[in-house]
């Protein structure tokens, strides 16, 4: 789903990034492991071990591996980078190399740090909604701000993680043409218009994580299916 490279061209998730993806993400995404752990904890507390879960933009399968270790057995991952999927642990999930959501009936959709690389977000969110059971849950993590002051604080966090200034500046330039940012308010209103109830469960400089429950409108009342 994601479009990274260490050269001067636009960011691509190539074999170089795939080989170090989790380490790279920990340095460049605020609270990367914390958000993943929240997803795993939520699944642990609210789903059966046989629930169907898909990780959209699964990269090398880090989240799926954690879910597998907790006993979940019907796990799926989709990513448009074959380099990522090639390095994912094949025994934990079924994987798809695609830029589309594989059609199925899901209990849980995880979509962390992926949609900001997709131009037509509404179309992809509609696909998620259509394939999510009533009462099902979407966890969505996105970059939601281009405010210069927020960017400055975000970059300061990268420096504290050991990322050098030149790497920060180069990656910012590489992402310019491949990352399409929308605001927190845009995500909330768009998701609510599709029948989700939305809560913010994590936020850091420029990034927001939403917990979205799919509900059904029947005779003037929202029913969750739970």
Tell where the protein language model's regions lie, with residue ranges.
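Core SAM-dependent methyltransferase catalytic element
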Residues: 194-226
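Conserved class I S-adenosyl-L-methionine
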Residues: 1-48
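Class I SAM-dependent methyltransferase SAM/SAH-binding core
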Residues: 54-100
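A short SAM/SAH-binding and catalytic strip from SAM-dependent methyltransferases
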Residues: 108-121
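A short acidic, Gly/Pro-enriched loop at the edge of an enzyme's catalytic core
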Residues: 101-109
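C-terminal alpha-helical "lid/dimerization" subdomain adjacent to the S-adenosyl-L-methionine
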Residues: 143-193
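A short glycine-rich, Lys/Arg-flanked "PGG" loop and its adjoining helix->strand segment in the class I
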Residues: 123-134
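Conserved beta-strand signature within the Rossmann-like core of class I S-adenosyl-L-methionine
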Residues: 136-143
């Amino acid at each position: 789903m994601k479009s990274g490279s260490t050269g001067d061209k636009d960011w691509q998730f190539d074999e170089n990034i795939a080989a170090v993806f989790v380490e790279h993400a920990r340095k460049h995404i605020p609270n990367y492991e914390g958000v993943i752990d929240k997803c795993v904890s939520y699944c642990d507390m609210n789903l059966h071990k046989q629930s169907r879960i898909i990780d959209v933009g699964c990269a090398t399968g880090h989240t799926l591996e954690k879910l597998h270790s907790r006993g979940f057995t019907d796990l799926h991952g989709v990513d448009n980078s074959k380099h990522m999927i090639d390095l994912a642990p094949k025994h934990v999930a079924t994987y798809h190399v695609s830029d589309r959501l594989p059609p199925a009936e899901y209990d849980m959709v995880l979509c962390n740090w992926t949609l900001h690389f997709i131009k037509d977000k509404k179309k992809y969110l509609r696909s998620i909604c259509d394939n999510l059971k009533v009462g099902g849950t979407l966890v969505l993590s996105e970059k939601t701000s281009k405010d210069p002051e927020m960017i400055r604080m975000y970059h300061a966090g990268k420096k504290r993680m050991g990322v050098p200034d030149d790497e920060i500046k180069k990656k910012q330039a590489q992402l310019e043409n491949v990352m399409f940012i929308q605001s927190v308010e845009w995500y909330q209103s768009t998701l609510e218009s599709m029948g989700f109830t939305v809560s913010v469960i994590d936020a850091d400089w420029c990034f927001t994580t939403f917990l979205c429950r799919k509900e059904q409108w029947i005779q003037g009342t929202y029913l969750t299916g739970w």
